[in-house]
Structures are given as C-alpha cells and as structure tokens.
C-alpha cells in the first residue's frame, strides 16, 4: 500500500485531503452504505504516507505534539524539542514533556524510530531532508543547527534514526510514542461531522416516540395534554404544547441517544454517539482491508469539548462524491443538504474558536427558519446547560448575569446566545420531524380499528396547534429582535441583521398568520373573540408599520428624488392610518361595552399641538451627526479620486454607503417624529371624543411603544444596507480579491511617486548598481478596513501584502527580479553574472507567514476580528544569484510582538550569496550570511552610536555579537481599528510595523565566506580571519585585528586600536582629533593618511600642516585643525602615506615606502631600501642609507632629491602620461636628466621648465615621451620608456633601456648592457664587452658592438608576438660574416637587424640558424632545434635545448650539444676539437663533404670507449669525444669501435671494421666488404652490399644478422662444429652454441635466398647452404639438448646424425 497512497486519486480535493487513496475508497463506500454525508479535517501530509505504510494512529489519550521537520516528521517524538514545538519557550517545552509522560503512563510506549527506504525518499522529495553523506543527514530546518542526525541501516533493510546535540559525544536513538504493541503512532483522521439522512431514523423514531406503546397511546397522551392546554393561552401552556409536539423528533435525530464515555482519571476525553461509533467502526474495518491500522480514533467535532476551527473541510457525500469546501461554502452546502432531508447536529460546547465557525458559517444557514434563531425566548428558556454549568434564564442573559464570564474571556451573553444558536438549527429539524410524526399519527388514527373520529380530530387539532405556536413564535421572535436591536450594546452578527430584516419585512404576514391561526384554533370560544378583535387591530397596525418601514428602507436605495418623496408620503399615511385605525378599534370596543357611540373629531388647536410635537421630536444632535457623516463621505470621495486611478473603488463605495446610511437614519428620525406627532394628535382627538381619557391613555401607550420599536428598527435598516454593500463586494469578485486591490493600489501609488523614483535613482548611483530591486510591504488603508468592518468582511482580507519591482534610474522596468514566497519566508534574487543589482526594502519588510483572521462576538453589540500569523514567522531566507549584488536589510522587521506589545520572537535572516562580489547592509535582526564565491562585504553602518558589535573569527566563519542599547528597530505587531456602525462596534486587528526603541537587545550573526566587515557608529571590536579582510570600525572607539592575511583596516572616528596581525596590511587613517594605537604586526604594513574621511568635513582647518610621522619613534603627530593636536602611536609599520597637506615623514631602518601626496613634504628614508614619493608640491626627499627609489609625478614644481648612500633611482615614469598632460610639451620631450651635472629638467605643459636637484643618484627612469638620459662615471641604469629617447651611459658598466620608440643608445665606456625595445633602434656599445638584448622581432635595429667582445642576445624575442608569425617553429637566421640577422627565420625578410662588431650570438627558444665569422665566436642555440656553424676561429658552440646540429669548422673549437639528441659534423683532419654531446643520444658524423678526406686519404679511426677520433694511423689529428653515443664513418676504410653503451655505428662506403663493444649495438656496414663484430650484448648486424664477414662466438649474446643479398658473405664462429646446433624458427635460422646462452639468428633465412649467407666457418671446418639445410633436417629429428649439453651425446645419437655431421662439415 506504501507505493500506491499517492495514486488513484479521483480529483484534486482527494489529493489535498491527505487521506491515502486506498483508505479514501473505503470512506466513500461507507458514506454510501450509511446514507450519510461524512466530513473530515485535512490530514497532515507528512502523516499520509505513514498511514498508508501501516503506521498506527493516535487516540485521544495521546496529548504530545507531532513533528513537522526532519526525519521524525509525522511521528510524535518523546523529546518535545524534536516536535513542531522546536524553538518554543522553555515553559512550553516543559508542559509538552508532561504530556509525553502522561501518554507513556497510560498504556503507550517509547519506540526507537526506524524508517523504510520509501519513507526516506518521501522526506527528500518533500524537502525535509536536503542531503545525506555517510549516513549524516542535512536539512534546511533550524533544528539542524542544534542537533545532528544520522541513519544506520538495520538487518531488516530499514534505517534507524539517531541524533545528538551539536558538539555532543554519542548518538542516541530518536524515540517516538507508540501504541501498546510497540507500533509508532502518527496523527489520525479526524471526523469533522456526520450528516445522516432522516430516513435512517424513521423506524427508530416511531419506536422511540412510543417508548414501547402504540402510536395510538402516544396520541391519546398528546390529546389529553392538548385538552389541558386549551384552558388558556398563557406562556406556560403554549410551551407545554410545543414540548409535547416535538417529543419524538429530539430522540429520533440522536441528540439524546446513548453516548459512549471514556475516562482518563477524572478527565472526560471523549464523547461519541451510537451512530458515530457505528460509522467509525465501519471506516476502520475498511482501512484494515487495505493494510492500514485504525484510522479514526474518536467521535466528530460535534462532540468535541475543545473543537478546532478549520478553514477547509473535506466532504464525502452519501453518493460517494468528494469536494473541498471553505467555511462559506460549507455553510451553503449544509443548508442544501438539510433541504434534502439530511440532519446536521452542531456542537453545544464550543469555545471561542468553534463558536466563531458556526456563528459565521452555520448560524444563518439556509433551511433554518427565522423563528428558530438565537433570540427566541422559548428556545433560550429550554436550552440545557453545557457540561458542568447551570442553565441561564432569559432575564439573566439580558442582565449579563449568567455566570459564564470565566470561560476564556468570552462574555456571558455571547456564550449563552451561542448555545441558543446551536440549538436553533437542531430544533428546526425537530420541527420538521414533529410534523412528520404528527401526520403519521393522524393517518394511523384513521387506519386503526376502534379509533373514533374525535381522535382523528384531535390529531388534526394538535398539528394545527403546533402550526399556531410556530406562527406565534415567529411574531414574538420578530418583536424580540426589534426590541433587542434597539438596545445599546446588543450582540448581533451580519447574519442576524439579515434575519432581522427578513423578520421586519415579514411582520405583517406573520401578524395575519397568527391572527388567523389562533382564531381558528380557539374558534367557538366567545370569551376570546373580543380580545382578538383588538389583537387583530394591533396586528393590522403592525402590518402598517412594516409597510412604513419598507418605504423608509427605499429611501436608502439609489432612487430618483420623486420616488423618495413618494416614499416619505407613504410613511406618513401608513403610520397615521394605522394608528387611527387602532385607536378607533379600541374606542369602538370600549364604546360597545358602555353602549356609547360617538364620532372622532379633531380640533384645529389639536393639530397645531401635533405640529409642535413634530418639531420638538427632531434632535439637533441627531441632525449634527448626520451632517458630519455627510462631510466624511466627501472626504472619502477625495481619496477615491487617487485610489480609483489605480484600480481600487472601495473608497468611493464607502462614501456612497455613508450617504445612504445618512439618508436612512434621517428617514427613521423623521418617521419617529411624525409618529410622535400623530400619536399626540390622536390622543387629543380621542380626549375630545366620547371615549375620553381611556382612549388617550391607550393611544399614548401604543404610539410610544411603536415609536420605541421603530427606533429599534433603525439598526436593522442600516444593517440591511451594509448587507447590500457586502453583496456588491461579492459580485465584484469577493472580499478577498476586492480588498487586495486596495493593497495593489497603495503599492502602485508609492511605486509611481516622484520622491521614490528619485530616492531609488540616488541609491543606484551610490551603490554603483545596474538596477535597484524594490520590495514594498503595503498595509491596507484605514478606509478599506472600515469598509470591511461595516460589511462584515474583516475576516476575509489581508492587511498587508508584499510587492517587488525593478527600477533603473528610478524608472520601473519589466521582468521578475525576485521569486517571492511570503508564506515560507523566501526571497530568491534572479540575477546573472555580470549584473550589479541592488535589493532594498522600500517599506519595512513584514514577518513571513500567512495571515489568518477570525471574527468573534466580544460584547453585546461588539465584534472583534483577530489576526494571527501562521507558518514560518521567525525567518526570512534571501538567496542571491551570480551577480554582484547589494542587499540592504535596514528596513527588515526585526521583532514580532503580540497584540499587547509583548515580544513573541525575533525574526532571523538567512542570506545566501552567489558567485558575485556581494554587499549586505545589516540591521538589528539575527543574520546568517553565506557569501558564497566572490569578495563579499557585510556592513553594520546602520547601527547607532550606543550600539556595538563584537566580531570574532572561527575558521572560515565570523560570529558577530550585536549589542543594541536603546536602539530603534522595526517591530511588527497587531494594531486595532475601531469602527462604530450605528449601535454595532467593530474592532478589527491588522498587522502594523513601527519603528520602536528597545532597551537592550543582543543578537549574534554568523557570517561565512565574507572578506569585508564594516562596523557601526558604536564602540566595535572586529577580528579578521586568515583571508585578506577589509575591516572598518566606523565611528566610535573601535578595536580592529586583521589576523592573518593581507588586510585593509579602517579605524574611522574615535580612539581606535588597530592591529594588523600577520600579512601585508594597510591602515587607512584620517586627520581626526582622536589618538589611535596602530600595530602592523608581521608582514609589510602600510598606514595611509591621504584617505578622505567624513570626520575631516566637520573640522574647520586653519593652516596647512599635515602630519609629522617618525616610524623610528613610532609616532604620527596630527594637526587636524587650529589648536587641535593628536598623536597616533604606531609600531611594526613599514610604509606610510602622508596627508594632502604639508607633511614631515621619516622612516626607520627597515625597507620603507614613504609617500607625501599633496603638499610641500619633507621625507627621509633613513636606513633600508626605501621608496620615496613626494607627490604634488615642492618636496624634499632624502634617501640616506640603502638602495632607494624616488618616484616623481609632478612636472610643475622643482623637488630636491638626495639619494644618500647606496644605489639610488629616480623614477619619472608616472609624471607624464595621457591622463596628466593637457597640451603637447613645448620641447616635445619629457625630461632631460644629466647625472653628471646633478639635475633633471622637466618640460611642463605650461611651457615652463622645472628642475629637480638630484644628488647621489645612480639610476634614472624616464617618461613615456622623448627623454634624454645621461649617466655619469658610476654604473648607471637608464630607462627611456616610451618616446624616441637618447640614452647615454657614460663611464661605468651601465644598463640602458630604450623602451618604446626609435631610440639611440650609447654604452660609451664600460661593459654595458643595451636593450632597444620597441621601435627601430640604434645601439652602440662603445668600449668594453657589451651585451645587446633584443626583445622584438618585427623591427629593424642597428647594432654596433664597438671595441671589446660584444654579444647580441635574441633569447627573449621568442616571447613576443612578432616572432614566427606564420612561421611556426622558426627562430632567427644570423650570419655574423654577412652582418645580418633575419628575425623571422628566413633570409631576406623585412624584419632584420644590421650587426657589426658583434662576436657572440644567443638564439631564441625556436629553431635558429646561426653562423659565425672569422673571429672567435660564442654561438648559443638556446631552445629549439638549432643549426650552429662556427666558421673560422676558435669558436664555442652551445646547442642548448633541442636536437641541434653543430659544426665547428676551421679552428680549434669546443662544441657542446647540451640537452637533446645532437649531431656533430666533424672534419677528421681538423685536430684539437672538443665534442661534448651532453644529455641525449648524440652522434659524431665524418661523412660530409669537405671533411679532409680527399682521394688517397686515410679513413677514420674512432673509439667511443676511449673518447677520441683521428685519421687512420695519424694520432696527431686526434679530437676529444665526450658523451657521444653514435658515430658515422667516412667513404674510406674506417675503424669504428663502440663503448659499453648502446651504440649505432655506420661505416658507410669503404671496407670498414665495426666493433660494437658491450651493449646492445646496431652495426651498419653499408657499401664495401665490411667486418662486423657485435661483441657482447644483443646486437643487430647489417652487412649491406659487398662481401661481408660476421664474427660470432662464445660470450657474444644473441645477435641477429639482417642480410639483403649481394656479395659472398661469411659467418665465422669461434666454436667447434660439434658445438653448434641448427634449428629453424619460423622463417629464421637459429644457430646455437651448445653449453652457452649464445645464439645467432639469420633473419628471414627461409623467406628467400637474398637473406642467406653463403658459408659458415666453425674452427677449421665450413658448411655451405645445402649442408646447413641437411643439418637442420637431421637435428630436427631429435630434441634440443639444451644449453647444458656441450655436444650431442654420441651414445644416444643414431649413426644417421653422426654421418650427417661428418658429411656436411668439411
């Protein structure tokens, strides 16, 4: 069943119900079987799969709370902290713990929680588990911040759940509550109500009514009771008759049926009727059939002493159809079902929540006759008490003295009338059942033998009497309602107001019905006839009043003026005529009694008196109130002009409602005045008549009573008006949608305001954002709340809503910038990499969660709509995308308080960054921020001066303790708006955010992946971590500690202590009045006073003194303003930047960087290699000891520079660049520096030259323009940078750089190094051994070496894009003899250098070809496969990396192959050379032409083992060989001898002797008759053409001969013929020397004849090819004797083999 609980649902309602599909099928079957509608509360979705899995469900004996998070979701944890109560107050947890103990003490068990794999899958899909690694479970729930959970697989394939507190030692099992059998429990399926059909009780009603007697007996008792009742029409007898009539119905519907009680100690925990019990058992039997446990454990909410108020109810009809209904829909549905004969039994013991549900949804349901509603006195008198309480009387209720005041704060009257309402619906059904029973009884009377006609007559009379009583009750009810509504503080709902209106308009009809029915019932009783004549008149007057009231109501309609005037006339006529008619009836009756008759005469004077009475009846205060009400409507019209433009029409609707209310109340006031006047006139006329004073008295009493009734009807009239407007709202989409338009309109109004657009545009500029995402929380308007209250819709709206827009430059743009989930508290920013959005909250962001509203009667005529926020109220989660986002949290609500302002909880913020560089502007809330990738910043600048933060580093995390003292925080609470509507008062709660001041508040933020932290205005303490942090204290006396990493520290205003810690830190200071303590710690640290700080703006500066800083003393003296002085104490600071004023700065003995910035500064470097920069202004710079650098950037002043000791440099590279100059320089160059004359001339854009005095300076760096740099007799470094520079070194070993441009470089005397750089440069070395460094390939430079041994170096050229464009792998082509270097790897290219006087060349990293000249050259190949040729002279060739080719040519040369497989071309006749192969397998080659081997010359004699090579028999021609592996001979007769390594020896032409030596060698004889001896090792021998001889013997290893045909070839083996064993191995011939491991293979001997040798010699014998074949065939007949046998054993060899050996070896 586990696999199918989500499958098989018939519709969306089934799925939403949470009931497993298989169980639900059984429920529908039971509904059909029992002919009853079944209603259920929604099942927790986390319990759905558990029920389907067969988990047991809890009964009423379990009071503990289930869990809605983590692995235990749906179960009932023994530890309340693991339940849905997690995070609640300690006292709540303590009470929950008691509930758990109570459950365990009464038959329940604690069970170790285990889960199935399917359950784990569900938890993942539901988002309750977000990950699992090695059994450890992850989740987003806050509980996982306090607890760790893991699962372990058990032997039965389930997973045991364990937990421990974070940081705890051992895991323990999670225990949940189970039943007595040890099966875990989950929530059961709660039945809300059952509606059985009346047909279920027809038989039981009859037997119950008769109580064992016949129907005839029952009717006889009824007849006798009715006979007794005819003695009078007093209240007691009418009640008695009514009770008799309904006796059977009450029992029939089960309200008095046997109940089942279960007890737990003295507590009544459950009530269930017989029918409910029957249904429950049927449902559980169906559940068992599909593998579930009991799913329903108790009765319905109809018998629950503490019922719930649900927003939705799941309904299964008697036909098996299912649907999901809201409260309002349920009300209508129950009414429809009642009309079809189904009985709904309400709960009599509802508390506040339950009563509200039935007041709003069921109290005025269709099918409940108005006569059976709350205020019927007979109903009230017969209401039984709730359990344990006494029954109130009507009088007690009206006095509000019923003893109910202690119940949950509910007013006594409200609770009592609630019981009446509950009874009203039941008694309506009882009335219908009574009628059925009485009709059945009458028919039974007629059918039974022996029953007289009188019995049938009394049956009819009993029914008639019941109808009379019903009609009378309707009349009494209508009058009671009118009276009740006229009292101050009356309690009534909008539904009651509707009932009242119906009663008022039906008054005339009710009066006639009562008169007719009662007269018929008592027909024949003459003593009552006269009385009812008067009663008939009174009822006729009642009809007139009703008509008058109806006409008055028409005045409230939107009717033409003429129609309203007619209605007013109708009022006067009806009331006047009715009153006169009543008075006439009374007068005539009295006159008849006295036998006196007389006409009615009204004197003119009496009419005048009546007019006076009319004027007196109009109250000035009443008129004033109506006028004020009209003015308020005008104000609402003004509001409507703007709200209507944004789609909300409610203000206009409310204005019209008040105008209609004003008209209605004016009409009632006028009618009342007219009635008083008419009454007075009638009394006067009666007094003048014959009837005299009695008529006047009666008339006065009647008109006074009617006037009171009319005033009482005023409230129903305006209530009907409110109902009419409520219907209008329903017709316009319903209240929820209607009032949401108010929120939308208020949002649009603000979003389109000029002020907001400007503010957001400024924010975008200030934050350097690409757009601003504005989140606006909008509160409903006061006028909308007022309209909702009047129309009874205050519980059908939202008081706040959240809207999101994107703005660019203050204008709204399309797109969905965030995904907002208010219910779950989620904000996801939809941003992409490269964007720079900013998120801000335009209005304070309210708490997350959904709003639930409940309207409850709280006084006589008072209603209160309560609001409650449900869901995840304590946390917002904000998730960023990949952009660089600014998130402003300043206006996020930090606290949630209740209606009394008591703190419920703080609201936390989870902010999850993306890949960008994000900035979070924090507020007072508790924040957890994970910055993710990028460089992220959190700023607390919004905190006040009395607040402080303490930041500590915990590995990758920062913990930020915020101490808020008397701070302002945004707080959300509940406010109440009170609206008086006539006598009705509506108190409507709504969500409201305010800026509140708190005393002391401590919150702790956690920050992860954050690099930058900015403090607030208070005294903060901030400690960094191991990363490169940016820490700013803000205002206040702060303490900053950078920790490890290269940090930037900003103390800000106040007396700060700033510690750099490890790493190269930067301190940003201002010139404030505060003294600070600065400690750089380890690393190279810098203090900067040139950063503009806000505190400087508040100082009126008098003078231009900046700072006096002395790093050696550890002080920085500051003059922030006139007569103000402060000192910063510094230590472990290496670098310091001055202010924008005139500073004095001195370093210490460390390597300092000192920068004056603006102002006329004096800077001393002292010891160490310092960097000094004066900045703008007339500066004096002293380098003193050390190799110092002076950075010059101001060409408009003259500075004084003294380098002092050491090698010092003055650098002008930052002085002139396109961002500085505004016009071409007058002289067309940047600087002219002459160190020999100790000055530097600077050409300014103003055409004025300025000179810097430079002393003791060795080096100069020029500008980007045309410079002239001249050295002195010292070793100078002169760098021209850009422009066409002239650089002259002078004496000394100088380093000259031309930089960009066509430069002229002159080394002059000394061993100079010259770099031309970009451009066509001319470089002259002058005297000395100079070095020319060439770095570009696509230019034409002229290089003149001058005197000395000069070198041109192209090794850096390959690193530039100019080399080998389209010529991949080719370097330079240099020929010193021709004086040309082609730089693109081919001769004749356009990019070449002209060289002269150059002796040495260094090639590139590519393949170069470098040729020397007649001088002694040094040629270096560097990288690549180079070709180096020394030419004449004693040269040095170095191949470098790569497989190089080296040729020394003439002269005594030294050739070094270095790395790679190099090839040396050597002339054997050229003696005295050194050839060193270096790494790799290198080859010496004597084969080339011109190697001294002319005709008649001798061949080469070479020994790699001895390391020499010479002409044959001419040792004086010897050359030294080192690290050479291979050799190639000449065309003569050569002798090539290898060494112990693996050699390749190639004899080429001639009759060569090749000897491999030890190692696995390759010998190639090539042309000629060669002698090849592999010697030791496994060698490959290639004889080639000619008559070749191969030598082999003991100790030679395993050699292979590769013959290719031609010549007469021989193998000579140093062994006896009897030691050789011949065998065929594939196509090869193998010859083995027995007794050894040596073997000789002739490759492909059997493939064809070209691969064979002609003869083999062994000792003094030989064998030819034919003999070899015979030996192979003969030996193939015998097993190989192996290497151990020295010769074939003669004793075992047949004579045939011996004969073959003898015959073939000769």
Curated annotation (Swiss-Prot):
Entry EC number(s): 4.6.1.1
Annotated effect of mutating residue 65 to Q: Abolished adenylate cyclase activity
GO CC terms of this entry: extracellular region; host cell plasma membrane; membrane
Pfam family, one: HemolysinCabind
Outcome recorded upon mutating residue 301 to Q/K: Loss of adenylate cyclase activity
Segments of this protein annotated with the region D, Asp/Gly-rich: 1657-1706
SUPFAM superfamilies (UniProt xref): Adenylylcyclase toxin (the edema factor), beta-Roll
Region (B, Ala/Gly-rich): 400-912
UniProt PTM: Released in a processed form.
Xref: InterPro entries: Anthrax_toxin_C-terminal, Anthrax_toxin_edema_cen, Anthrax_toxin_edema_cen_sf, Haemolys_ca-bd, Hemolysin-typ_Ca-bd_CS, Hemolysn_Ca-bd, RTX_pore_form, RTX_toxin/Mannuronan_C5-epim
Positions where lipid (N6-palmitoyl lysine) attaches: 860, 983
Name of this chain's protein: Bifunctional hemolysin/adenylate cyclase
């Amino acid at each position: 069943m586990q696999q199918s609980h989500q499958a098989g649902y018939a519709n969306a309602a089934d799925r939403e119900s949470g009931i497993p599909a298989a169980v639900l099928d059984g429920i529908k079957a039971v509904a059909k079987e029992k002919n009853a509608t079944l209603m259920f509360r929604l099942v927790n979705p986390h319990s759905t799969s558990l029920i389907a899995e067969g988990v047991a469900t809890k009964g009423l004996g379990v009071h503990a709370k289930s869990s809605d998070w983590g692995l235990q979701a749906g179960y009932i944890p023994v530890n309340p902290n693991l339940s849905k109560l997690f995070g609640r107050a300690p006292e709540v947890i303590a009470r929950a713990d008691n509930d758990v103990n109570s459950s365990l003490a009464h038959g329940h068990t604690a069970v170790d929680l285990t889960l199935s794999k399917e359950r784990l899958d569900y938890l993942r899909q539901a988002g309750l588990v977000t990950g699992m690694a090695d059994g450890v479970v992850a989740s987003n729930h806050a509980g996982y911040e306090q607890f760790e959970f893991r699962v372990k697989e058990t032997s039965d394939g389930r997973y045991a759940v364990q937990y421990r507190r974070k940081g705890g030692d051992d895991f323990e099992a999670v225990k949940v509550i189970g039943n007595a059998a040890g099966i875990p429990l989950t929530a059961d399926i709660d039945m809300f109500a059952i509606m059985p059909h009346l047909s279920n009780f027809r038989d039981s009603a009859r037997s119950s009514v008769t109580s064992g007697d016949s129907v005839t007996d029952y009717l006889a008792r009824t007849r006798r009771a009715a006979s007794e009742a005819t003695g009078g029409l007093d209240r007691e007898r009418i009640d008695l008759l009514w009770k008799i009539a309904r006796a059977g119905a009450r029992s029939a519907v089960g309200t008095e049926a046997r109940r089942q009680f279960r007890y737990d100690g003295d507590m009544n925990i459950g009530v269930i009727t017989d029918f409910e019990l029957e249904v429950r058992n049927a449902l559980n039997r169906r559940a068992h059939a599909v593998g579930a446990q009991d799913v329903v454990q108790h009765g319905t909410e109809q018998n629950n002493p503490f019922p719930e108020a649900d927003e939705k109810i799941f309904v299964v009809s008697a036909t098996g159809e299912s649907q999901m209904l809201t409260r309002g829909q349920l009300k209508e549905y129950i009414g429809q079902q009642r009309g079809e004969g189904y009985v709904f039994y309400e709960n009599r013991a509802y508390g506040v929540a339950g009563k509200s549900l039935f007041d709003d949804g069921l109290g005025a349901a269709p099918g409940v006759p108005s006569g059976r509603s709350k205020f019927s006195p007979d109903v009230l008198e017969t209401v039984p008490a709730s359990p344990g309480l006494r029954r109130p009387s009507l009088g007690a209720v009206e006095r509000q003295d019923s003893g109910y005041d202690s119940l949950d704060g509910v007013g006594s009257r409200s609770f009592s009338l609630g019981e009446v309402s509950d009874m009203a619906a039941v008694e309506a059904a009882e009335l219908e059942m009574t009628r059925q029973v009485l009709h059945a009884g009458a028919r039974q009377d007629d059918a039974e033998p022996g029953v007289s006609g009188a019995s049938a007559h009394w049956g009819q009379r009993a029914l008639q009497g019941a109808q009379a009583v019903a009609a009378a009750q309707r009349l009494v009810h209508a009058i009671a309602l009118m009276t009740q509504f006229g009292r101050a503080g009356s309690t009534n709902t909008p539904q009651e107001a509707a009932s009242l209106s119906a009663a008022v308009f039906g008054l005339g009809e009710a009066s006639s019905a009562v008169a007719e029915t009662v007269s018929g019932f008592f027909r024949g009783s003459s003593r009552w006839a006269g009385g009812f004549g008067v009663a008939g008149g009174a009822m006729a007057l009642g009809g007139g009043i009703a008509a008058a009231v109806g006409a008055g109501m028409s005045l409230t309609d939107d009717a033409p003026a003429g129609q309203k005037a007619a209605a007013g006339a109708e009022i006067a006529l009806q009331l006047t005529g009715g009153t006169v008619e009543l008075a006439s009836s009374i007068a005539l009756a009295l006159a008849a009694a006295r036998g006196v008759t007389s006409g009615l005469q009204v004197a003119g004077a009496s009419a005048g008196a009546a007019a006076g009475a009319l004027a007196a009846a109009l109250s000035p205060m009443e008129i004033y109130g109506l006028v004020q009400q009209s003015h308020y409507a005008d104000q609402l019209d003004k509001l409507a002009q703007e709200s209507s433009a944004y789609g909300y029409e409610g203000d206009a609707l409310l204005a019209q409602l008040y105008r209609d209310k004003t008209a209605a109340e004016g009409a009632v006031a006028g009618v009342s005045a007219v009635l008083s006047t008419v009454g007075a006139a009638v009394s006067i006329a009666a007094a003048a008549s014959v009837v005299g004073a009695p008529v006047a008295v009666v008339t006065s009493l009647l008109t006074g009573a009617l006037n009171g009734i009319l005033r009482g009807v005023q409230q129903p009239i305006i209530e009907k008006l409110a109902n009419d407007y409520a219907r209008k709202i329903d017709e316009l989409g319903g209240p929820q949608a209607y009032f949401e338009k108010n929120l939308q309109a208020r949002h649009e109004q603000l979003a389109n305001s000029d002020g907001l657009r400007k503010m957001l545009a400024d924010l975008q500029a200030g934050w350097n954002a690409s757009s601003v995402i504005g989140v606006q929380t909008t509160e409903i308007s006061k006028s909308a709340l007022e309209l909702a209250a009047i129309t009874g819709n205050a519980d059908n709206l939202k008081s706040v809503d959240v809207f999101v827009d994107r703005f660019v430059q203050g204008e709204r743009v399309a797109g969905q910038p965030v995904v907002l989930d208010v219910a779950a508290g989620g904000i996801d920013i939809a941003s992409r990499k490269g964007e720079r959005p900013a998120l801000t909250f335009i209005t304070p962001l309210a708490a997350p969660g959904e709003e639930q509203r409940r309207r409850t009667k709280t006084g006589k005529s008072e209603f209160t709509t309560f609001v409650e926020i449900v869901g995840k109220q304590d946390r917002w989660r904000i998730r960023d995308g990949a952009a660089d986002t600014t998130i402003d949290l300043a206006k996020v609500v930090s606290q949630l308080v209740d209606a009394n302002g008591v703190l419920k909880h703080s609201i936390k913020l989870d902010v999850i960054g993306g890949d960008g560089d994000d900035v979070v502007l924090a507020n007072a809330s508790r924040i957890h921020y994970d910055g993710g990738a990028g460089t992220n910043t959190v700023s607390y600048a919004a905190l006040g001066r009395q607040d402080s933060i303490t930041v500590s580093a915990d590995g990758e995390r920062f913990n930020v303790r915020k101490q808020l003292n008397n701070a302002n925080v945004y707080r959300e609470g509940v406010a109440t708006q009170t609206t008086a509507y006539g006598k009705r008062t509506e108190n409507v709660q709504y969500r409201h955010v305010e800026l509140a001041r708190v005393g002391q508040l401590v919150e702790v933020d956690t920050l992860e992946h954050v690099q930058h932290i900015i403090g607030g205005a208070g005294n903060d303490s901030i400690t960094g971590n191991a990363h490169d942090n940016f820490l700013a204290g803000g205002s206040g006396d702060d303490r900053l500690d950078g920790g490890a990493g290269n940090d930037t520290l900003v103390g800000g205003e106040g007396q700060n202590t700033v510690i750099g810690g490890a790493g190269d830190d930067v301190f940003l200071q201002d010139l404030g009045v505060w003294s600070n303590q600065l400690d750089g710690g380890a690393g190279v640290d810098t203090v900067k006073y040139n950063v503009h700080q806000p505190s400087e703006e508040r100082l009126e500066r008098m003078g231009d003194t900046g700072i006096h800083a002395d790093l050696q003393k550890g002080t920085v003296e500051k003059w922030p303003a006139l007569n103000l002085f402060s000192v910063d104490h510094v230590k472990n600071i290496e670098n310091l930047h001055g202010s924008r004023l005139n500073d004095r700065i001195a370093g210490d003995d460390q390597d300092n960087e000192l920068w004056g910035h603006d102002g006329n500064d004096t800077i001393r470097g002292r010891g160490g290699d310092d960097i000094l920069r004066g900045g703008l202004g007339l500066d004096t710079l002293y380098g003193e000891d050390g190799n110092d650098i002076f950075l010059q950037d101001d060409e408009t002043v003259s500075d004084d520079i003294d380098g002092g000791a050491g090698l010092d440099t003055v650098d002008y590279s930052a002085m002139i660049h396109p961002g500085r100059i505004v016009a071409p320089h007058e002289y067309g160059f940047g600087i002219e520096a002459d160190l020999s004359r100790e000055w530097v001339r600077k050409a300014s854009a103003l055409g004025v030259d300025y000179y810097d005095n430079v002393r003791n300076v060795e080096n100069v760096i020029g500008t980007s323009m045309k410079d002239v740099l001249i050295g002195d007799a010292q070793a100078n470094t002169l760098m021209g940078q850009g422009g066409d520079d002239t650089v002259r070194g002078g004496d000394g070993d100088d380093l000259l750089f031309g930089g960009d441009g066509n430069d002229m470089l002159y080394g002059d005397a000394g061993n100079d190094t010259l770099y031309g750089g970009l451009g066509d440069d001319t470089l002259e070395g002058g005297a000395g051994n100079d070095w020319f460094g060439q770095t570009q390939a696509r230019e034409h430079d002229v290089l003149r070496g001058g005197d000395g041994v000069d070198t041109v170096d192209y090794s850096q050229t390959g690193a530039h894009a100019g080399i080998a464009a389209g010529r991949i792998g080719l370097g330079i082509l240099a020929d010193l003899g021709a004086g040309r270097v082609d730089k693109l790897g081919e001769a004749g290219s356009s990019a070449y250098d002209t060289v002269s006087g150059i002796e040495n060349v260094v090639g590139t990293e590519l393949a170069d070809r470098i040729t020397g000249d007649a001088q002694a050259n040094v040629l270096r190949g560097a990288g690549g496969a180079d070709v180096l040729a020394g030419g004449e002279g004693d040269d040095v060739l170095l191949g470098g990396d790569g497989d190089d080719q080296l040729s020394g040519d003439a002269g005594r040369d030294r050739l070094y192959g270095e790395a790679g497989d190099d090839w040396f071309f050597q002339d054997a006749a050229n003696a005295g050379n050194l050839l060193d192969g270096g790494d790799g397998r290198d080859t010496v080659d004597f084969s080339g032409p011109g190697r001294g081997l002319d005709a008649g010359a001798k061949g080469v004699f070479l020994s790699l083992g001895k390391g020499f090579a010479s002409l044959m028999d001419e040792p004086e021609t010897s050359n030294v060989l080192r690290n050479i592996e291979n050799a190639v001979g000449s065309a003569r007769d050569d002798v090539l001898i290898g060494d112990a390594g693996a050699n390749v020896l190639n004899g080429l032409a001639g009759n060569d002797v090749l000897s491999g030596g030890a190692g696995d060698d390759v010998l190639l004889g090539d042309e000629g008759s060669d002698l090849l001896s592999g010697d030791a090792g496994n060698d490959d021998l290639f004889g080639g053409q000619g008559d070749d001889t191969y030598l082999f013997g003991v100790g030679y290893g395993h050699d292979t001969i590769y013959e290719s045909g031609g010549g007469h070839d021989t193998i000579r083996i140093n062994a006896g013929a009897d030691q050789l064993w011949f065998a065929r191995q594939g196509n090869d011939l193998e010859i083995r020397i027995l007794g050894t491991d040596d073997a000789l293979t002739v490759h492909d001997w059997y493939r064809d004849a070209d691969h064979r040798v002609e003869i083999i010699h062994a000792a003094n014998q030989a064998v030819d090819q034919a003999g070899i074949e015979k030996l192979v065939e003969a030996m193939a007949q015998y097993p190989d004797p192996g290497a151990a046998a020295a010769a074939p054993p003669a004793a075992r060899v047949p004579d045939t083999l011996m004969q073959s050996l003898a015959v073939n070896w000769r």
